[in-house]
From Swiss-Prot:
SUPFAM superfamilies: Leech antihemostatic proteins (SSF57262). Its main location: secreted. The keyword Glycoprotein applies. Glycans are attached at residue 45. It is found in: Secreted. One of its GO terms (cellular component) is extracellular region. Residues 39-66 are annotated as: Disordered. This is Hirudin-PA. It comes from Hirudo medicinalis. The modification Sulfotyrosine is found at residue 64. Keywords: Disulfide bond, Glycoprotein, Protease inhibitor, Secreted, Serine protease inhibitor, Sulfation. Residues 55-66 are annotated as: Interaction with fibrinogen-binding exosite of thrombin. One of its GO terms (molecular function) is serine-type endopeptidase inhibitor activity.
Length: 66
C-alpha cells in the first residue's frame, strides 16, 4: 500500500520506507508501531506519480486509533 505524500511539516502521515517521500532534504520520522509517521522541516515534495491518482491510497480513518 502506498500512502499519500507528505506536504507541510508534521501535517500528514507518510510512508518512510523506500524512497524519501518527503523530498527537499526533509526527513520522515517513524511513529510508534509504524503509525503516525511524519515529515519534518518545511514542505515536502511529492513523489513522482503515475498517470492514475488511484495509485496513491489515502490512509483510512481507522489508522488513527490511539
Amino acid at each position: 500500500i502506498t500512502y499519500t505524500d507528505c506536504t507541510e511539516s508534521g501535517q500528514n502521515l507518510c510512508l518512510c520506507e523506500g524512497s524519501n517521500v518527503c523530498g527537499k532534504g526533509n526527513k520522515c520520522i517513524l511513529g510508534s508501531q509504524g503509525k503516525d509517521n511524519q515529515c519534518v522541516t518545511g514542505e515536502g515534495t511529492p513523489k513522482p506519480q503515475s498517470h492514475n491518482q488511484g495509485d496513491f491510497e489515502p490512509i483510512p480513518e481507522d489508522a488513527y486509533d490511539e
